[in-house]
């Protein structure tokens, strides 16, 4: 090897190896501090891509497991509501068995049918109001897809069915034939129902609108009814006249009234600024014109100044008999409380049902209009008639409420085979509950499988991207030793060119 000083090959070789060990040491320290074998794509490009796909699957499957739990909750919510529907159906069946017994009176059958109707209405309420996160689960047929995988199409479908009285085939279910109609039935079963209740207070008769509660007289041309503000009596006047106060009138009085002479006498005998009382009112003498009694006095009523003017007393008159009196404002006495007011009338409030009752009004029959026909209801509202015949409420085959008279009702029979109808409804509810129970078990299985898959994927990803501390500690120790050795050897290599100097001596 030639002896040169410009290029130190041994030093360069040593530096290169030292850089390699430095890089190895940095990599080992980075992995040990992060716990990851792959901290960037350069560490393992293929491994990073594989681990990233594992991460996507793990996150997707973890969310899918939560979705499956939501699916279980939906099924449990629906099944719980169906359990209540089942309980109501069981009670309806029990009542139906009771109703088929020949020992029941008409009153017994009516009571049984009333409870059956309440149970059926509760079934409809449960159907309409049961929901999960805003989704009604029993009010319509619906298929709800639950994503239980990390990829498209990996779903489980929950079949939700409409379960209500109509879908169960119990619409119009009756063990006692058509039900005698009441006012409440008319209001709840039909739209745009109008009419009025009649009331009598002595010889006076009134109507109360069944919708607005407005009270009018019971006449061909009804008048609106009010409550007298003074005495609480019923009246058709919308206001009551307040009593004018003679002392305070804007029109000039005739000469020599008691009020005019009294005020004139006070002015004549006093001076400006003096006060005096008259009829319970305190006045102040504002102006005194001469010594004859002419002038002005004032008082304050309800925060406003009212001035009385005395005039027409001749100069030098020895008495005040010619005095006239005029007020700046008309003042009245309220019929309600007897206090001064500037209003000539007090408004009456519109009458309400409670006002009729306060005046001992007695309820009479009602007139109810449904679909253009006017029906008559008795005072208690539990009997509806038309042309002298009692009306019954019935339902058509399509479930639409209708009114029929007693003749048509007599020809109607109770629901045929009521127990078979209930059993059919129970079977349908059982089928839906069984389906929901099976879907819950399926979700449980899916959740278990998802958990196992996530565990295995985490293990696989760990083998790719997690650091092996035993290996990395060994690599770090090796790199540290190589660093120390390389540094020492580099010092020796840098001394090699010094040997050339011996040739120059």
Swiss-Prot record:
Keywords attached to this entry: Bacterial flagellum, Secreted
Cited Gene3D superfamilies: 6.10.280.190, f41 fragment of flagellin, C-terminal domain (2.30.220.10), f41 fragment of flagellin, middle domain (2.170.280.10), f41 fragment of flagellin, N-terminal domain (1.20.1330.10), Flagellar export chaperone, C-terminal domain (6.10.10.10)
One GO molecular-function entry: structural molecule activity
Gene Ontology annotations for the cellular component aspect, listed alphabetically: bacterial-type flagellum; extracellular region
Subcellular localization(s) per the UniProt record: Secreted; Bacterial flagellum
Domain of life (superkingdom): Bacteria
Main location (coarse class): secreted
PANTHER family: FLAGELLIN
Function: Flagellin is the subunit protein which polymerizes to form the filaments of bacterial flagella.
Recorded family membership: Belongs to the bacterial flagellin family.
Additional free-text comment from the UniProt record: Individual Salmonella serotypes usually alternate between the production of 2 antigenic forms of flagella, termed phase 1 and phase 2, each specified by separate structural genes.
Protein name in the entry: Flagellin
């Amino acid at each position: 090897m030639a002896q040169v000083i410009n290029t130190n090959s041994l030093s360069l070789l040593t530096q290169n190896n030292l850089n390699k060990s430095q890089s190895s040491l940095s990599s080992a320290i980075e992995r040990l501090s992060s716990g990851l074998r792959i901290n960037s794509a350069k560490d393992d490009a293929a491994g990073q891509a594989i681990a990233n796909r594992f991460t996507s699957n793990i996150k997707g499957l973890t969310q899918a497991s939560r979705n499956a739990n939501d699916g279980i909750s939906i099924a449990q919510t629906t099944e719980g509501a169906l359990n209540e529907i089942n309980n109501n159906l069981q009670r309806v069946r029990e009542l139906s068995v009771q109703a088929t017994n020949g020992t029941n009176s008409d009153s017994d059958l009516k009571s049984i049918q009333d409870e059956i109707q309440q149970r059926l209405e509760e079934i409809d309420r449960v159907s309409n109001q049961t929901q999960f996160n805003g989704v009604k689960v029993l009010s319509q047929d619906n298929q709800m897809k639950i994503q239980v995988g990390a990829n498209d199409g990996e779903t489980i479908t929950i079949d939700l069915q409409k379960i209500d009285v109509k879908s169960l085939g119990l619409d119009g279910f009756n063990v006692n034939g058509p039900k005698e109609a009441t006012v409440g039935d008319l209001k709840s079963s039909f739209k745009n129902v109008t009419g009025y209740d009649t009331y009598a207070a002595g010889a006076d008769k009134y109507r109360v609108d069944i919708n607005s509660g407005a009270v009018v007289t019971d006449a061909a041309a009804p008048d609106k009814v009010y409550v007298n503000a003074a005495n609480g009596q019923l009246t058709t006047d919308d206001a009551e006249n307040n009593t004018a106060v003679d002392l305070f009138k804007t029109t000039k009085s005739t000469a020599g009234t008691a009020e005019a002479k009294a005020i004139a006498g006070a002015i004549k005998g006093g001076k400006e600024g003096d006060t005096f009382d008259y009829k319970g009112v305190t006045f102040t003498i504002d102006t005194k014109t001469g010594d004859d009694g002419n002038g002005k006095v004032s008082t304050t009523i309800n925060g406003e100044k009212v001035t009385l003017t005395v005039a027409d007393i001749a100069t030098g008159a020895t008495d005040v008999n010619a005095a006239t009196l005029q007020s700046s404002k008309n003042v009245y006495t309220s019929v309600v409380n007897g206090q001064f007011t500037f209003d000539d009338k007090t408004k009456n409030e519109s009458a309400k049902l409670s006002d009729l009752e306060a005046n001992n009004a007695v309820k009479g029959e009602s007139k109810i209009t449904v679909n253009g026909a006017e029906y008559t209801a008795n005072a208690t509202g539990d009997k509806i008639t038309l042309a002298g015949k009692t009306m019954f409420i019935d339902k058509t085959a399509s479930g639409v409420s209708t009114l029929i008279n007693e003749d048509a009702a007599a020809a109607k029979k109770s629901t045929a085979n009521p127990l078979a109808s209930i059993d059919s409804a129970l079977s349908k509810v059982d089928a839906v509950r069984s389906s929901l129970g099976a879907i819950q078990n399926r979700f449980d299985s899916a959740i278990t499988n998802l958990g196992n898959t996530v565990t295995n994927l985490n293990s696989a990803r760990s083998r790719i991207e997690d650091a092996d501390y035993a290996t990395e500690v060994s690599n770090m120790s090796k790199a540290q030793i190589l660093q120390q050795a390389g540094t020492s050897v580099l010092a020796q290599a840098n001394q090699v060119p010094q040997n050339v100097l011996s040739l120059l001596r």
